[in-house]
Amino acid sequence: MASTGTKKRVCYYYDGDVGNYYYGQGHPMKPHRIRMTHNLILNYGLYRKMEIYRPHKAVMEEMTKYHSDDYVKFLRTIRPDNMSEYTKQMQRFNVGEDCPVFDGLYEFCQLSSGGSVAGAVKLNKQQTDIAINWAGGLHHAKKSEASGFCYVNDIVLAILELLKYHQRVLYIDIDIHHGDGVEEAFYTTDRVMTVSFHKYGEYFPGTGDLRDIGAGKGKYYAVNFPLRDGIDDESYDKIFKPIMCKVMEMYQPSAICLQCGADSLSGDRLGCFNLTLKGHAKCVEFMKQYNLPLLLMGGGGYTIRNVARCWTYETSTALGVEIANELPYNDYFEYFGPDFKLHISPSNMTNQNTGEYLDKIKTRLYENMRMIPHAPGVQMQPIPEDAIPDDSDAEDEAENPDKRISIMAQDKRIQRDDEFSDSEDEGETRLPGEGGRRDHRSHKAKRSKIDDSPGKEADKEAKSSDASKEAKPAAEPQAVPMDTTPAPPPKKSEDKPEASKPTEVKAKPAEKEPGEGEASPADLVVPVPKVSAPSEGATLPAVTIPPSSGTSQPPADPPVSAPTPTPASAPAEKQD
């Protein structure tokens, strides 16, 4: 992989469960395409260059910041096995045909919305430059209505989050279908400008006319570029860059949301444009150059092998790295036959977008944008709390220390041994014969090899011998049996003894037994003061021997006349 352009901090949101959801037999929307994209990203090694997060599941409180309470409650309640009980609500909320009820519908909406909102929070905190959620970009969902395979409008929720920190947010839509749900949500405000390049005329959703420019305070803040069939890379580049340059000049946003619907690619199952991956990704590259917080989202795309190719290539574009045209082997390699290449070729369909037609639309849009006051501002106001707390898990555990979690949720928090865990020092040899990939098992193997090495064994033996020496206590003096018979009175001396200096009595150390440690203390010097002769019948005062450090205290005040200790005993005082 070669580096291209300026490096950006990129974070990427993906949940492994998102590919399990299934709209139904024959339905063109297949969430499995997101899993295929993720697998290509892994096998190209792009995951090493960005931060990967599992998105939280957006809760009802987050979804109802835009959608109505009744609609979100309905999505949370409806299931394939209870559809018959909600016939009226299904008609009211437009659920049933294009937007079917399937197993896990609400959880799918939670994951899609959670990734986009989490990316917006990350951008608000300036912890990343580009946030990616390919599971998002569902731009048709309305406030109280599903539409165009979309149930919850994650884009609107993400923009509402960005508006907490940014005065003006720019939304760009390069899906082949008009981004009607996002335009409708912000049609009357000047804080969000919506720009959509789409197929127009007898094509879903039928909105996005050149004359749809917004209303009220939002007048001229909706920009629609209607296109005809067959537009190619060259024509698309000639309209996208000039229009976006003018928008950036006049509006001066501080954050950008880019919906990267891949149904505008050549050969799409429901599309009729003729773009290649390079033409599609040029839009990402161009907006990246403005160095503003950028949120990339998915959207349409119904030839799933090309969707995976497109979003993988645009991930590499966001990262600023070049990836090979040869596809690496992956879990879905057979999907990409017969050429097994990354890039696709345009078809030979006719481009009905003539130069004259495109110039006419550009001129009209320039005139509308001249009506925009430069960089409209907003009054200062308190910043609301973020949708996602910094440490939500820790707070939940503190509030509910006894709350149990499901086995599935617990397993998701455990890193599997075979998960990718390469680090930046991959390839450096830490032990002979070992590479750089490290996981739980290789870590254990490495520790066991280190512990079994010869140097380690020698260190262990040295430490154990030192420990045994320290642990072995010094020989304690044994209790000396004392003679309790009172000493006979001394003979009377006619001459009075003169007071003199005290004499030193050296205690003779006991002889060592073979193999025994040295007796402690070795030479104990005890000063014995000389006293004058006592009167007849008096007894000699006892002499107290101070205990040595680390030995037990001997009996207090033993008589002076003690028998000679045994050889194993502690040294005793020798009497003159």
Swiss-Prot record:
Stretches the record annotates as Histone deacetylase: 9-320
Catalytic activity: N(6)-acetyl-L-lysyl-[histone] + H2O = L-lysyl-[histone] + acetate
EC number from the UniProt entry: 3.5.1.98
Amino acid composition bias (Pro residues), ranges on this chain: 555-568
Cited Pfam families: Hist_deacetyl
Any single Gene Ontology cellular-component annotation: histone deacetylase complex
Biased composition (Acidic residues): 387-399
Annotated catalytic residues: 140
Keywords, alphabetical: Chromatin regulator, Hydrolase, Nucleus, Repressor, Transcription, Transcription regulation
Highest taxon listed in the record's lineage: Eukaryota
UniProt biased composition (Basic residues): 438-447
GO biological process: chromatin organization; heterochromatin formation
Subcellular location: Nucleus
Region (Disordered): 374-576
KW Transmembrane (keyword) present: no
EC category name: hydrolase
Protein family membership: Belongs to the histone deacetylase family. HD type 1 subfamily.
Protein name as catalogued: Histone deacetylase 1
Organism (species): Strongylocentrotus purpuratus (Purple sea urchin)
